[in-house]
């Protein structure tokens, strides 16, 4: 017999099924400190094994933005959870902290257990990549708020650091080298503009195969998951090799780089020092976007940029052979970010 909640559009039984389906995915993410209490009123994590003199918890929260619309249109939900985790844990590790645990929030018009499982499986995969435990979350069915197929996902990450080892603007010095870590593509920013350029202005289809993106289709390129930098950065952080880190997300170089150094400094960027990924060249071409604006919106092929003292550059490059030396920190005159070579 249909109950009152079902008549209002909320499928309670589907919600119960979701809880059963996602248990196995969260269990894969367990790490030291996990108490295995998924399903309680709050997620619990034991910090007693982390022997720090002045422990500091560092938290981050984010979503995936309108990249979700592509996932919904393409009915490909398996990797969007990786994006959600990446956006949060990359912010946490950029502060100098080791991610410990993660919680997700999923709001939908209609709960489809298989779809929710696919999304949460992606979250769990991202957590495994970041070595962060998935200790809780919320799935909210809101038929009056969302269309039947629509959903939104957000995440919350918490990490830990010794207070003296936090990456703060005061750590970054004049003469420090800027080391860029390659991105996997657009990551999770700029999709409102990108969708407008490719699908509205130029009527591309997600199945289109552009030579510059081969062997991927346009849709596959745009749904490539955001790269998670935790495994690359933690050894450097523990060895004291990094003065600062900037996660290049919304706002690109111009907004995010200045967040890691003081107002007395500027980032001098050598533009020809790394390969700009083909997807960005296509966006600039078809969107007729001025070069400087591209660096104000997108990561341009570098998802994380580190400030490293001259004496540590060689060691960092040894540990991160795929990274690029892209510039230096110099005294600021006017602009916080200076591009060498004409844009």
UniProtKB/Swiss-Prot annotation:
Pfam families: AIRS, AIRS_C
EC number: 6.3.3.1
Pathway: Purine metabolism; IMP biosynthesis via de novo pathway; 5-amino-1-(5-phospho-D-ribosyl)imidazole from N(2)-formyl-N(1)-(5-phospho-D-ribosyl)glycinamide: step 2/2
GO terms for MF: ATP binding; phosphoribosylamine-glycine ligase activity; phosphoribosylformylglycinamidine cyclo-ligase activity
Primary site of residence: cytoplasm
GO CC annotation: cytosol
Subcellular location per the Swiss-Prot or TrEMBL entry: Cytoplasm
Record's keyword terms, sorted: ATP-binding, Cytoplasm, Ligase, Nucleotide-binding, Purine biosynthesis
Catalytic activity entry: 2-formamido-N(1)-(5-O-phospho-beta-D-ribosyl)acetamidine + ATP = 5-amino-1-(5-phospho-beta-D-ribosyl)imidazole + ADP + phosphate + H(+)
EC class: ligase
GO BP: 'de novo' IMP biosynthetic process; adenine biosynthetic process
Record has Secreted as a keyword: no
Domain of life: Bacteria
Family assignment from sequence similarity: Belongs to the AIR synthase family.
HAMAP family, per database record: AIRS
Protein's recorded name: Phosphoribosylformylglycinamidine cyclo-ligase
UniProt gene name: purM
């Amino acid at each position: 017999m249909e109950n009152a909640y079902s008549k209002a559009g909320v499928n309670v039984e589907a919600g119960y099924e979701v809880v059963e389906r996602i248990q196995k995915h969260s269990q894969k993410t367990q790490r030291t400190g996990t108490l295995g209490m998924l399903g309680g009123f709050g997620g619990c994590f034991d910090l007693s094994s982390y022997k720090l003199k002045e422990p500091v918890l560092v938290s981050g929260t984010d979503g995936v933005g309108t990249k979700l619309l592509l996932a919904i249109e393409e009915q490909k939900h398996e990797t969007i959870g990786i994006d959600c985790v990446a956006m949060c844990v990359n912010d946490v590790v950029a502060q100098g902290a080791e991610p410990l645990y993660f919680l997700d929030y999923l709001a939908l018009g209609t709960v489809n257990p298989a779809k929710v499982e696919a999304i949460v499986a992606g979250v769990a995969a991202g957590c495994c990549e970041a070595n962060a435990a998935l200790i809780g979350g919320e799935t909210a069915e809101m038929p009056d708020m969302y269309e039947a197929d629509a959903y939104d996902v957000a995440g919350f990450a918490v990490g830990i650091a010794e207070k003296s080892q936090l990456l703060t603007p005061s750590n970054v010095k004049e003469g420090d080298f800027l080391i860029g870590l390659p991105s996997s593509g657009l990551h999770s920013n700029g999709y409102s503009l990108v969708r407008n350029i490719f699908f509205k202005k130029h009527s591309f289809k997600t199945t289109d195969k552009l030579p510059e993106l081969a062997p991927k289709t346009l849709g596959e390129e745009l749904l490539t998951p955001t790269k998670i930098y935790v495994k690359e950065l933690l050894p450097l952080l523990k060895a004291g090799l990094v003065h600062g880190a900037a996660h290049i997300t919304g706002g690109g170089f111009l907004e995010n780089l200045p967040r890691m150094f003081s107002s007395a400094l500027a980032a001098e960027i050598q533009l020809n020092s790394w390969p700009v990924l083909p997807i960005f060249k296509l966006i600039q071409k078809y969107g007729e976007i001025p070069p400087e604006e591209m660096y104000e919106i997108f990561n341009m092929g570098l998802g994380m940029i580190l400030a490293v003292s001259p004496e540590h550059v060689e060691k960092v490059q040894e540990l991160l052979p795929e990274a690029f030396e892209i510039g230096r920190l110099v005294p600021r005159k006017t602009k916080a970010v200076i591009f060498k070579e004409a844009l």
